[in-house]
Amino acid sequence: MDNLANQGVIVLAAGGTGGHLFPAEALAHELRARGWDVHLATDARAQRFVGAFAQDHVHVIRSATIAGRNPVALLKTFWSLWQGNLDSRKLFRRLKPKLVVGFGGYPTLPPLYAASNMGIPTLIHEQNAVMGRANKGLAGRVKAIAGGFLPENSGAYAAKTVITGNPVRPPVLVAAATPYTPAGKDDRFRLLVFGGSQGAQFFSQAIPAAVALLPEHERARLLITQQARKEDEASARQAYEKLGVPADVAPFFNDMPARMADAHFVIARSGASTVSEITVIGRPAMLVPFPHALDHDQAANAAALAAAGGAEVVRQADLSPQRLAEMLQSAMNEPERLEQQAKAAKSVGKPDAARLLADLAEAIASGKTVQEFKEGNRP
């Protein structure tokens, strides 16, 4: 880190979940390599995800989620957001950032509002195919919008939107160098199941139930890695033990990219970071969009990969244990199809997204407009 602060300070603001923080981490890595001193503004949930940032470069900003219509609750929420605005102003007066970049989630509202009101250049990155509520609230105020899966050249903010893709962390790029090798019909079949950084209760119940329906000789082939919420971890592990299926079950895996590279098949939710990592690494997948997402963003993300032939998309409501068992059995016995899916997924991956987003960030920090950036006028 000897070259830190040569260029100045950039603050990244992200909600405290992996979906928001992983792309922020990827951009931070790229910007540090270019000589920027990168700080993170986030909320208290972020603790297990921020290992890529020095402790004195992580700043917890007070915030709250806008939900419901209870007047008292709304008053408390707006008070917390106002306090976060004051926190952000104090932080920015000290750090004097040349740019503030938001990655979505309500904790980004105070820093981005404060920055725009203080005349600091601002940029937001929207990972999903449908813009989230926090980013929608900021889109009219910021200098530029970067998109992961946003439709290109459409919408009210098309003129200041650049499609960069979703930045992926360095371990994902390392994992991407591992070619996909299909399992032979008598080989061990490595299945990876995860529901994003916060897990998925549905998978903890549905996958063991489906595995129980497989013929014994096919169960014997399975090696399962499954991310489960802490409250579901023990029951999922016990279910696999009863079936005699080796399974590594945990609430969080720090080496998830390596595990994905090792997998023959992935069953997952379809958050933007998940879909981006699947495409960069290039693995066949069954995507089950979270059905209660307010903006149906996961369904749109999944559709983008399915259209390329890189994944099957199944609604959770349609996924009985019997159907899941049939789809899993099909995957285990059709290695050629999975190999084609892996190639299709990798063909739409954007491993250079962090570089493109860093280029845009540097342009906005230097005072360039999005139009100038699109025309090739860059720092």
UniProtKB/Swiss-Prot annotation:
Pathway(s) annotated for this protein in UniProt: Cell wall biogenesis; peptidoglycan biosynthesis
Top EC class, one word: transferase
Pfam families: Glyco_tran_28_C (PF04101), Glyco_transf_28 (PF03033)
Job description of the protein: Cell wall formation. Catalyzes the transfer of a GlcNAc subunit on undecaprenyl-pyrophosphoryl-MurNAc-pentapeptide (lipid intermediate I) to form undecaprenyl-pyrophosphoryl-MurNAc-(pentapeptide)GlcNAc (lipid intermediate II).
GO molecular function: UDP-N-acetyl-D-glucosamine:N-acetylmuramoyl-L-alanyl-D-glutamyl-meso-2,6-diaminopimelyl-D-alanyl-D-alanine-diphosphoundecaprenol 4-beta-N-acetylglucosaminlytransferase activity; undecaprenyldiphospho-muramoylpentapeptide beta-N-acetylglucosaminyltransferase activity
Membrane topology of this protein: Peripheral membrane protein
UniProt record similarity statement: Belongs to the glycosyltransferase 28 family. MurG subfamily.
Species, as recorded: Brucella ovis (strain ATCC 25840 / 63/290 / NCTC 10512)
Localization: Cell inner membrane
Any one Gene Ontology cellular component term annotated for this protein: plasma membrane
Primary localisation category: membrane
Residue numbers binding UDP-N-acetyl-alpha-D-glucosamine: 17-19, 128, 169, 197, 298
Protein EC: 2.4.1.227
Name listed for the protein in its UniProt record: UDP-N-acetylglucosamine--N-acetylmuramyl-(pentapeptide) pyrophosphoryl-undecaprenol N-acetylglucosamine transferase
GO biological process per UniProt: carbohydrate metabolic process; cell division; cell wall organization; lipid glycosylation; peptidoglycan biosynthetic process; regulation of cell shape
Catalysed conversion reaction: di-trans,octa-cis-undecaprenyl diphospho-N-acetyl-alpha-D-muramoyl-L-alanyl-D-glutamyl-meso-2,6-diaminopimeloyl-D-alanyl-D-alanine + UDP-N-acetyl-alpha-D-glucosamine = di-trans,octa-cis-undecaprenyl diphospho-[N-acetyl-alpha-D-glucosaminyl-(1->4)]-N-acetyl-alpha-D-muramoyl-L-alanyl-D-glutamyl-meso-2,6-diaminopimeloyl-D-alanyl-D-alanine + UDP + H(+)
Keywords annotated in UniProt: Cell cycle, Cell division, Cell inner membrane, Cell membrane, Cell shape, Cell wall biogenesis/degradation, Glycosyltransferase, Membrane, Peptidoglycan synthesis, Transferase
